[in-house]
Amino acid sequence: MAHSIGNGFPPGVFSQLTRRQLVQNGVFGAGALAVGSLGLPRAARALDEINFWATGTLDIGDDGWRTFAYDSGVKVEFTDNGNDPGPVVAKLAAGNANDIYDVAGLQGGSEKELARRGLIAPWDISQIQNYASVWQWAKDIPYLTHDGKAYGIPTVINADSIIAIRDKAGSVDSYGAIFDPKLKGKTAMEDAWINSVIFTAIYLKNSENAKIAEPGNLTADELGLVMEFLIKHKRDRQFRTFWNGWEQGLQLLANQEVWVMTGWEPIVYAARMRGVDCYYAVPREGYEGWANNTILLKSAVVRGRTKAAHQLVNALFSGFYGCKLGLLRGYVVPTDNNVAYATAHANAFDPAGVRKLADHVKQKFAGKIYWQNTRPDNFQLYETWWQRLRNA
């Protein structure tokens, strides 16, 4: 169970979270090694109970889920899936996850693979009334559909870039700062190809005129170019480290071992709470966009929980969940219902703050965005190259 997350960003909670962590194993080959047996919640007994298996940062805590159940009529048993796409998909494909959970939340990119194998079911959008309120550009996110059917619901969105310490790094507006020899030994990237490769590809495409078509889905030649670039800089000791997991990334900033690094925006919130004057840079090359999408597991249909699953998703867009999640994580559920809910419940949420957060994310997506892809065409080659980087 993942109900231990409280208000704010306590690092202990996130020490095991790797929100867009390296997919270390293939799903149907080496990935089977990651399946194991799950630590299982109690099985949902009633048709109005849903076992929700999603990224820990999507949890809103016991009090939040109680309010959610009161408003929606759906009781939620939340379990953190770690959001490492490789093991999650493997547990759905070869493990027992589909026997236990009803609805899952996962970084976008795996929907088509899961749908083709019959592991997830399509959503009936007509049963999700609040889906009409979802921002259109969120509905247009890649990876949501397969064969004309909706398999992913864009529940949480954001765009990632660079974290910089103001009095050490000054004004940063380019990923080039990560590779700047003047900052040698004071930069870092995440130990995850699903983030670090696309950041590097975005930089090379836009600032070094590299012939890269789609940074989120590199050809073999493009991937080789990007990885050789990273390996060279690693050997030159440009990077302090490749960080892994929430706590390490936060600690690097808190101790000021690193002055500039690619990373997640909630790390900025947490570092500021520790007194670090850091900021999230606006990169001239563009952001890495991502969405955590909600998927309907096929076994939930067999167990007769389709109606409750659709009620759950509808309630995610009703406003309360978006307000609560924004307060806890600084993440946005892409609907204006959040502002409407905050306005109607100003004793619990600050309407101006909710609107400001929404405008902040909208502003990011009004610029240049390259979508993260957790399952690029050559994902196994990505894994091979990333291991070479680690060994370099």
Model feature map: region roles:
Residues 1-21:
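N-terminal secretory signal peptides
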Residues 359-392:
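Conserved C-terminal helix/tail region of periplasmic/extracytoplasmic solute-binding proteins
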Residues 58-62, 105-111, 115-248:
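Extracytoplasmic ligand-binding site segments that recognize negatively charged/polar headgroups
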